């Protein structure tokens, strides 16, 4: 019995010492990861559009269940079931997928002087943040894409967000009306208008 106890103590100490190693954190760091800055602008746009449309679909399905838009007149209670797997899916898609992709698209468009890509980024941002504030009221907006440095963004007032959504759309109209002087022009990567 004493031997089993000693072996258990030695194993516990060995596991504890190994788990405290700093080299453990290098295990899950991908060696071939691509930095967002090195991705071509025409490869960022489809991701931003897809994340936006997924978020819109998630919001539509959630609201349609509440409003009974997807209900039918069947008498059987098991026939007409439409369930959302997660109630936070819209929020997750907007803040962890759509807005970060749009931020990268905005930065890349600004760096390459691609006015039409920048206009698309502004429209997508207005769509995402506009519907988010419609659904939830005051939401994180100004600090929303600073996740790498700020895990707790402050909530911005809905009126400020609506004012900025209108400004984003006005800016996009101006950018769309100006000639694109960049070599990067939206084409097949624009999943909506191509």
Label the predicted regions:
Residues 73-184:
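Conserved, well-structured interaction surfaces
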Residues 1-30:
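Bacterial Sec-dependent N-terminal signal peptides
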Residues 28-33, 143-145, 187:
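Solvent-exposed, flexible loop/coil residues
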Residues 46, 139, 191:
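A broad, low-specificity signal marking well-ordered, structured residues that form hydrophobic/aromatic
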Residues 186-194:
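Short, intrinsically disordered, charge-balanced linker/junction segments flanking boundaries
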Residues 20-85, 89, 93-96, 100, ...:
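Membrane-proximal, proline-rich intrinsically disordered regions
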Residues 6, 12, 39-40, 113, ...:
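Residues at the start of alpha-helices and the adjacent loop-to-helix junctions
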Residues 5, 9-12, 133-135, 185-187:
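A generic structural signal for short, solvent-exposed coil/turn residues
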């Amino acid at each position: 019995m004493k031997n089993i106890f000693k072996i258990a103590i030695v194993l516990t100490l060995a596991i504890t010492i190994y788990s405290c190693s700093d080299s453990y954190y290098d295990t899950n760091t991908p060696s071939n990861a691509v930095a967002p800055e090195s991705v071509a602008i025409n490869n960022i746009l489809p991701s931003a559009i897809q994340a936006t449309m997924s978020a819109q679909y998630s919001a539509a399905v959630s609201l349609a269940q509440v409003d009974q838009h997807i209900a039918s007149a069947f008498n059987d209670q098991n026939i007409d079931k439409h369930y959302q797997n997660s109630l936070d899916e819209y929020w997750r898609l907007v803040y962890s997928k759509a807005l970060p992709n749009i931020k990268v698209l905005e930065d890349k468009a600004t760096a390459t002087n691609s006015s039409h890509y920048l206009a698309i980024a502004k429209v997508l941002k207005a769509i995402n943040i506009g519907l988010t504030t419609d659904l939830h009221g005051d939401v994180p907006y100004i600090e929303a894409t600073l996740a790498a440095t700020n895990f707790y963004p402050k909530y911005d007032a809905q009126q400020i967000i609506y004012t900025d959504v209108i400004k984003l759309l006005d800016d996009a109209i101006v950018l769309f009306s100006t000639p694109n002087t960049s070599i990067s022009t939206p084409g097949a990567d624009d999943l909506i208008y191509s």
